[in-house]
Structures are given as structure tokens and as C-alpha cells.
Amino acid sequence: RKDSIAITYKYLDSIRSIPFDSTINDFDKYFSVPSSYLYLGNNGAAAYSLIYAPNAKPGWDAGFHTFDIYRYTLEESKFYKTNRPFSQLSYQLASGKEQMIKVLHTQSPRTNFSFGFDYRLISAPVFFITQNTNHKNYRLFSNYQGKRKRYAAFFILVGNTIKASQNGGITADSLLQDPNRKQRFTVPVNLGNKNAYQPNPFQSGVITGNINKDLTVFVRQTYDIGKKDS
């Protein structure tokens, strides 16, 4: 039976319409850490690419790229076009009470206007003291095209809150063999030992670690003054 919904999307600097793919192809992309990256073991932890890729963006760079793979960016923003409202909800649960929630909603009330939002929560209390991560990302997007297809407007609002605790590693490897420390959060670490800790998926605070926040608002307006193709 033919699908009743037709949905395509475009990237910000592209004119190519891409059909929305809901199959299991590239299923590994549902995990927030790409297969070419090395990370510290829990979802949301610091990571770096095993494939060399220089930063070619012009301008000053602060050098903080440890958590880049967990951020929403302008470049990856999509503008959808659909004949019906479309929503997608994803929930993933892993060991150590790791969880990831993703929400997407988009709709096109008119053929020349569409809007939607993305949201993602990554929460990983993990096993050791002061190792938890809690990342929140959201994105609002909208685009409009005039009836004569000359005027166009694009709007994107992207926000990221990155929280990642740091414990400096355990004090000694031999403690992992201690039968009295089967609960790994009882193993002492180099930073944050005094923190009362219980693995809790709803724990979002960071006492010792990194908290990075950024907000980007993007508006683009264009007008085509070219002659219509004959």
C-alpha cells in the first residue's frame, strides 16, 4: 500500500530535496557517537575523531571541541516539507541507566510554509563517581517562500546545554579486584570523592566537570531577481 505521507527535507545551503528515510539503513547513526570516534565509555562523555580532520572554518577558534558531536549545529539543520504533520519519538536505554530521548515534529500548514522542532536529551549516570553526563539540545526551524517563488525566509534557533562530570580516573587499578567494591561507585577517584553519589538517571547536576551552554539565532532572507526560465 502506498504511504499516505510524503516528506522531504533540504539542508540550509542546498537546493536538493532528500526523501525522508525511516528504514534501518545506517542504524548506527541513531547512536550519538560516530563509529569513527573514540570516547570515554559512556554516552555524552568527551570524544575525539580517529580520522584526522582539520578545522577549516575561518575566524578565531577557542579550541573546545571535546563535545562537538553532541551539539546541534546550523549546518545539520533540516527544513522539511510534508503533506501531513509528522512526529518521530525515539527512546534508547542502555546499561548503567544510560538513556537518550529524541523528539522531532514538523508540519507544513501551507505549501510554501513549514516549521518544526528537534529535541534531544542524553543522560548517563554510569558506574563511577563524578562521571555522569547530561546533555540537552533543542532546535526550532521554519522556512517560507513567496507565492511567486522569489522571496524566501529561513529561521533557525539552536540551543545546547552540555554537562559532563570529570573524576580524573580511579586512584588505583587494583581496587577493581576488591570484592567489597563490586558497586563501582564505591571505588575512589581522583576528583569528587566527597560527593554523595547514587546512580540516578534523573541526576542532572555537575559538581566537578564541564558545563557549556550556547545559543544561536539565525535568520536569512533572500529575493530572486532573475528572469523566469522560459
What kind of feature is each model-predicted range?
Residues 82, 110, 146-149, 226-228:
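Outer-membrane beta-barrel channels and translocator barrels
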Residues 1-52:
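Solvent-exposed N-terminal domain segments of exported/luminal and surface proteins
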Residues 89-93, 119-121, 155-159:
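Transmembrane beta-barrel strands of outer-membrane/channel proteins
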Residues 87, 115, 151-155, 230:
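Transmembrane beta-strands of outer-membrane beta-barrel proteins
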Residues 103-107, 117, 140-144, 219-225:
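Residues on the lipid-exposed face of transmembrane beta-strands in outer-membrane beta-barrel proteins
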Residues 83, 97-101, 134-138, 213-217:
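Residues that define the transmembrane beta-barrel architecture of outer-membrane proteins
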Residues 60-62, 73-79, 83-104, 126-127:
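Short strand-turn segments of transmembrane beta-barrel domains in outer membranes
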Residues 35-36, 60, 125-137, 141-213:
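Outer-membrane beta-barrel translocator/channel fold
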